[in-house]
């Protein structure tokens, strides 16, 4: 069975559409959902990632949720291997895999079957020492000197990816982007639906989403995760919302600090959405749908369009 991928920026309604499509397909063929949100891989990171509760999943099987402890590092290579195995197993059962998420590297590594450059522990350790000694800003500047294109696509605060880029450049003697495959035919013949809407509409959704997370207990969730090792996590501790709350708690956790964390989470999410849009819009395989209207008839029409693309994509 050809998979369907539903991608797009945070807050565009991907999870809702995936459930609606799976329910519509149920009378014809069962569907199973494969998560492609990097932070939903973590157990206990529920409120801040808008992870669907078991009750909200409508009885539809979900994969790649709650598979890591917060102290573990979520690598794209590990995700690709595990998620691809899930998809192969779903297809073997005669079911439809629905890939859902907005983590750019995770989505593309899966759909384009990336092969990852080898690693060298000694080379990586040396760059990690440089990171510790010089700081993330100076190391990003070093990356910019060696590979300006890579530096332009990696956040100056993302020490882990900066180290990885420098490692790959040193090992291969080529720019970091040279190790990434070009966009071609999607693996398994996957049909790709992209959801997006006008920026003012999405900004309003992100504001409501952020407020809801804090009101539903994001701060307490972070406190619980700290006891589970969140501070030791290379990737989990940097997640939007969690990083901001963690910094506020470290500074004393007063109401004003937490209000500032809420505001920083909102603006950080808006910046992340811009990156998601830039990344996904360059993929010519994506069939884009306007997710601005969310009434019952609009949801039905969106399911119709997703299934039309899934049935007829070439």
Curated annotation (Swiss-Prot):
Keyword tRNA processing on entry: yes
Domain of life: Bacteria
Class of enzymatic activity (EC top level): transferase
Cofactor(s) for this UniProt protein: Mg(2+)
An annotated GO BP: tRNA modification
Gene Ontology terms for molecular function: ATP binding; tRNA dimethylallyltransferase activity
The reaction(s) this protein catalyses: adenosine(37) in tRNA + dimethylallyl diphosphate = N(6)-dimethylallyladenosine(37) in tRNA + diphosphate
Record: residues binding substrate: 10-15
EC number of this enzyme: 2.5.1.75
UniProt-annotated binding residues for ATP: 8-15
Keywords carried by this UniProt record: ATP-binding, Magnesium, Nucleotide-binding, Transferase, tRNA processing
Site (Interaction with substrate tRNA) location in chain: 103, 124
Pfam families on file: IPPT
Role according to the record: Catalyzes the transfer of a dimethylallyl group onto the adenine at position 37 in tRNAs that read codons beginning with uridine, leading to the formation of N6-(dimethylallyl)adenosine (i(6)A).
Complexes and interactors: Monomer.
PANTHER family found in the cross-reference section: TRNA DIMETHYLALLYLTRANSFERASE (PTHR11088:SF60)
Protein family (similarity comment): Belongs to the IPP transferase family.
Designated name of the protein: tRNA dimethylallyltransferase 1
Organism: Mycobacterium ulcerans (strain Agy99)
Chain's gene name: miaA1
């Amino acid at each position: 069975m050809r998979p369907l991928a539903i991608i797009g920026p945070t807050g565009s309604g991907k999870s809702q559409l995936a459930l609606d499509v799976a329910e519509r397909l149920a009378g014809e063929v069962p569907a199973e959902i494969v998560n492609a949100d990097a932070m939903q891989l973590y157990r206990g990171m529920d409120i801040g990632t808008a992870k669907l509760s078991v009750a909200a999943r409508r009885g539809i099987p979900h994969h790649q949720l709650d598979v890591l402890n917060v102290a573990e590092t979520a690598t794209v290579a590990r995700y690709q291997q595990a998620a691809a195995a899930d998809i192969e197993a779903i297809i073997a059962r005669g079911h439809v895999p629905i890939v859902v998420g907005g983590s750019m590297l995770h989505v593309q590594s899966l759909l384009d079957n990336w092969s990852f450059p080898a690693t060298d522990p000694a080379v990586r350790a040396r760059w990690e020492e440089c990171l510790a000694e010089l700081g993330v800003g100076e190391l990003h500047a070093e990356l910019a000197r060696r590979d300006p294109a890579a530096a332009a696509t990696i956040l100056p605060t993302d020490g882990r990816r900066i180290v990885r880029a420098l490692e790959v450049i040193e090992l291969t003697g080529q720019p970091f982007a040279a190790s990434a495959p070009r966009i071609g035919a999607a693996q398994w013949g996957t049909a790709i639906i992209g959801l997006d809407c006008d920026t003012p509409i999405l900004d309003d959704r992100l504001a409501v989403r952020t407020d809801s997370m804090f009101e539903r207990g994001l701060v307490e969730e972070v406190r619980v995760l700290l006891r589970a090792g969140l501070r030791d996590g290379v990737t989990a501790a940097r997640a939007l919302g969690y990083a901001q709350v963690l910094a506020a708690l470290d500074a004393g956790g007063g109401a004003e600090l937490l209000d500032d964390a809420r505001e920083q989470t909102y603006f950080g999410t808006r910046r992340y959405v811009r990156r998601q849009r830039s990344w996904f819009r360059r993929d010519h395989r994506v069939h884009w749908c306007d997710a601005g209207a969310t009434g019952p008839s609009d949801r039905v029409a969106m399911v119709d369009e997703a299934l039309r693309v899934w049935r007829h994509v070439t």
